[in-house]
Amino acid sequence: MHEKRLTDIQRALAIDKVVNYIAENLGNYPFSKITVAQADYERNPLYGLSQLPRFISPFESDFLFEIKFLKTYLNNYLHTILKLDPRKDNWIYDGIQIYWMIKYMETFYPETKMMGNVAQLKLFKGYNIVSADFNDQYSYLYLLMARKNLDQPLSNPKNTLIRFNDKIASKYKAGLILNYLDSYIGNDYMAKSIQDFIILN
């Protein structure tokens, strides 16, 4: 993955931070190497961040690289170590990925807003969306489909989902469900359950 405005040292620090966080929470990657390419990210981008034009940069370059790398690394990590049916059980991959992305943001960037630096501009101060936390974007994008009555069950096979649900809404819904269960049960039970699930599969 590349971010032209970052030095090699900044990239290495971001990669190290993400890899250590995932190893600490999901376990060490069992193989000697993992490939994380720009093409992987482009196939499965973080919607919201990737749709903004280059001249509007509400987030710092190092933050953008870190979040993009986190999403892509988690995706490749989970698809390599979990032996699930990618058609029927795709929501499990997506749910674990989004759940740990939410936890990562809560751990390292709890004050980051969904609109980034735009939240500091006086012109936008009166809008609720500007004050929304970064993790609120998952529920906003999921609810976009739910309010249009186009929500589909997570148990539906991947090939039966409409495009928006396949690419965005179902992924975010799965992650939000795991995060909700974590909040409801407490005691890091969900994190431990995910670790056990990965070990068993």
Residue ranges of predicted features:
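Juxtacatalytic substrate-recognition/specificity segment
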Residues: 1-89, 96, 100, 162-163
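Acidic/His/Gly-enriched intrinsically disordered linker/tail segments
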Residues: 88, 92-176
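Short coil/turn segments at secondary-structure boundaries
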Residues: 33-37, 116-117, 192-195
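Single, functionally critical "micro-switch" positions that shape active/binding sites
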Residues: 70, 74, 93, 114-115, ...
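A generic secondary-structure signal for well-formed alpha-helical elements
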Residues: 26-30, 76-81, 85, 100-112, ...
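An acidic- and aromatic-residue-enriched active-site/binding cleft used to recognize and process polar
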Residues: 39-41, 102, 132, 195
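Amphipathic alpha-helical substructures
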Residues: 4-5, 30, 158-201
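Glycine-rich, acidic and aromatic/proline-enriched surface loops and short helix-turn segments
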Residues: 24-28, 41-46, 139-150, 174, ...
